[in-house]
Amino acid sequence: MTAEETVNVKEVEIIKLILDFLNSKKLHISMLALEKESGVINGLFSDDMLFLRQLILDGQWDEVLQFIQPLECMEKFDKKRFRYIILKQKFLEALCVNNAMSAEDEPQHLEFTMQEAVQCLHALEEYCPSKDDYSKLCLLLTLPRLTNHAEFKDWNPSTARVHCFEEVCVMVAEFIPADRKLSEAGFKASNNRLFQLVMKGLLYECCVEFCQSKATGEEITESEVLLGIDLLCGNGCDDLDLSLLSWLQNLPSSVFSCAFEQKMLNIHVDKLLKPTKAAYADLLTPLISKLSPYPSSPMRRPQSADAYMTRSLNPALDGLTCGLTSHDKRISDLGNKTSPMSHSFANFHYPGVQNLSRSLMLENTECHSIYEESPERSDTPVEAQQPVSSEAMCQGSGLEKEPANGAQNPVPAKQEKNELRDSTEQFQEYYRQRLRYQQHLEQKEQQRQMYQQMLLEGGVNQEDGPDQQQNLTEQFLNRSIQKLGELNIGMDSLGNEVPVLNQQCSGSKNNGSNNSSVTSFSTPPQDSSQRLIHDTANIHTSTPRNPGSTNHIPFHEDSPCGSQNSSEHSVIKPSPGDSSGNLSRSKGEEDDKSKKQFVCINTLEDTQAVRAVAFHPSGSLYAVGSNSKTLRVCAYPEKMDASAHDNPKQPVVRFKRNKHHKGSIYCVAWSPCGQLLATGSNDKYVKVLPFNAETCNATGPDLEFSMHDGTIRDLAFMEGPESGGAILISAGAGDCNIYTTDCQRGQGLHALSGHTGHILALYTWSGWMIASGSQDKTVRFWDLRVPSCVRVVGTTFHGTGSAVASVAVDPSGRLLATGQEDSSCMLYDIRGGRMVQSYHPHSSDVRSVRFSPGAHYLLTGSYDMKIKVTDLQGDLTKQLPLMVVGEHKDKVIQCRWHTQDLSFLSSSADRTVTLWTYSG
């Protein structure tokens, strides 16, 4: 033994000891916070297991069930047991939300949370091990609090989630193991090792003190040896050296052969008494203030200061040099429980900066309409329309902004007191936000009554002539505009870009036609087409365009709509240059189903569901992202042979990267120049891949952004107005914010807050405008020049509204289309500020909507496994021709038009992505 020895101690191992201790004492809130801050996890897990663990700890139960789908086909995997564990945890958390609200005397909101709990219980029935287990779960519904049950006396969400993972980890460890060459011995602290080391350290200090007393002649009795133990301050023997060991080594061997009495050490531990406030705050904070599924509870951060700070720290407003990509995150969102897979499939969009190519997907005036010989065409029933402004329009999110310098940090002396008041402050903030929401509801009710009164006053008598109808309609609209102006509702910040609606009415009246509709949205007047082309020549939208094209966007001509348009199959007149003739068909043509308008050309099959597809702006490539974490870039065929549809070929894969993300790829998007490919995933990361379209290879390291604290549902690009670089727009679950990122500088720009539910869809146009669709049943328009929300469009025109799963804006920037979870599509006049029509093209969730580059057709994909095209070349206030153009064997997730040809891509849960083309 040398005079100096070295002992290696890793701080990571010390943290693992602490994590093991916190886990053994069920202090899981502190354990998870330490994991997040240190980045250390006590255990040896594979990447897949770590990802599954994070999903469970975040409470993303639908994501967990989807992640584990590949294992469910294996016989050894206990699918029933796994689903029982996950759904039971989901049910208990729903009960926790309900109980917390009932404890706060909010009976008017119980129906929302109780409905969620009952749905979870219903799903659990088929997976319960026995009827007794199911009966016990049913009994929990009758208790005023979940913690009143003896089995759940100390239940809290954080501890329950940790135990949930430990239980399922044993089940899936065999299928997704860690490195088999490694042992957990060097990676995991266990058996309460920290406590053992503390006790051994105390005994060591006692031994040192006793030996020193013997050497110096100081008398210490045997009973006094352990009396001087001080765990916090020690006994003065603080020097870390090997003197004791060196002394023992110099003792003769005969000393160790002496007989001695073996003594037992009894350890009495005074257990920690947790404060009751801490436990109750834990029940309330993660599940009520952020994750509650009902609208009266804020679904974002429970403390408004965080949201205020986010808004006040905009670089454009405060001159900061960087964005908010690294601001603190809270645990992920559990709210907005919806139908299966409803928030799993995001849509992606791709902005373009060039004009359309010469073919314009065969939409020019020299091509035949795709509806001329369609065997599956149908007319969509039009719901009762209300030609009024949107149900909800407001500036920003409705919360008052507070400057960043307005919040003063508490002095250290008051820090402990402030921490004790956290729970009370959260309650106060919750009630403040609830009051704001109630005031908002009262305002909406007043607007609804006003609209109803205006309809009664301005209703059109069917016996009146068309001229009188026109006058009544104009009077009604003028009163609507006046009332809405008084309520300060609208997109005032857009200025001259929003024409007055009554001027549109006057223009329609002066056309000389007997049109009973207020405005023809199908086409602008002929004499204004050049002006519109000039206005939109430089518009950049999320629709990809051909870089080499110089042609202008063609616009439609006005189509007069007389009373004959009310027939079952309306006659829609084509534009003057269209050679397609009359688009209506005879009964014989309707019965002929032998000819398909669109046929399958290429089909790519994956091992799991394919979520995301995106055409390169040039149209020569398209990107595919799937649940298997694989990113592919495929070649678009140079020659389209529609006659070979009976035997579709596999596309040529030019680029492939396995495990591009740790989780499923939810969305993909190309930059306007086509040199960047962005992907979003449920691993909460956005990756931007520099890509060379000519060589089909990555040209540099990936850019990785981690500003989101939930699944990224959608991505879109727009060209930066100042730097010329690509600006990435991303949104999803978690904090429900929209983030803008300068990809050239790798810096965050803005964090746009306002939505109160998962953001499912994004779309960009005009170089600064963004449309977002959300689980909160609204569409919001954002102007990056401000930057803030400039308009809110609700979906509650009919019934209770529905979550918005997809949004799109036509190339002219005049018309918004939405796809919603109640199987409906909404067409909304952006400039006029009113809904044009809401119709139901599908029988299930509409997950994808896209305008063709010429805005002649609207492509929709749905969970009903069908892909349909709506003809927009007529009066959009009337019934619209509809045609089935494709079908999958499972849910359709995304559909995207080609940039030039009359072709489109569709992705599906049947694990395929299909390229369809017009058969002519």
UniProtKB/Swiss-Prot annotation:
User: Which GO molecular function entries does the Swiss-Prot or TrEMBL record give?
Assistant: protein-containing complex binding
The cellular location(s) given in this protein's UniProt record come to: Cytoplasm, Cytoskeleton
Locate the compositionally biased regions of type Basic and acidic residues: 371-380
- Provide the alphabetized UniProt keywords: Cytoplasm, Cytoskeleton, Developmental protein, Microtubule, Phosphoprotein, Repeat, WD repeat
Record-level GO cellular component terms: axon; cytoplasm; dendrite; growth cone; microtubule; neuron projection; neuronal cell body
Q: Where is the LisH domain?
A: 10-42
Q: Where is the CTLH domain?
A: 45-102
Q: In which tissues is it expressed?
A: Enriched in the nervous system (at protein level).
Q: Where is the composition biased (Low complexity)?
A: 506-523
GO BP annotation list: adult locomotory behavior; anterior commissure morphogenesis; autophagy; brain development; cerebral cortex development; cerebral cortex radial glia-guided migration; corpus callosum development; detection of hot stimulus involved in thermoception
Record's compositionally biased regions (Polar residues): 538-552
Q: Where is this region: Disordered?
A: 371-422, 501-594
- Major localization class: cytoplasm
Q: Which residues carry this modification: Phosphothreonine?
A: T285, T543
At which residues are the WD repeats?
Answer: 605-644, 660-699, 707-749, 754-792, 799-838, 841-880, 887-919
The record's SMART domains line, in alphabetical order, gives:
CTLH (SM00668), LisH (SM00667), WD40 (SM00320)
Q: Which residues carry this modification: Phosphoserine?
A: S289, S292, S297, S312, S423
Assembly description: Interacts with MAP1S (via WD repeats).
Name-wise, this protein is WD repeat-containing protein 47
Q: Which organism is it from?
A: Mus musculus (Mouse)
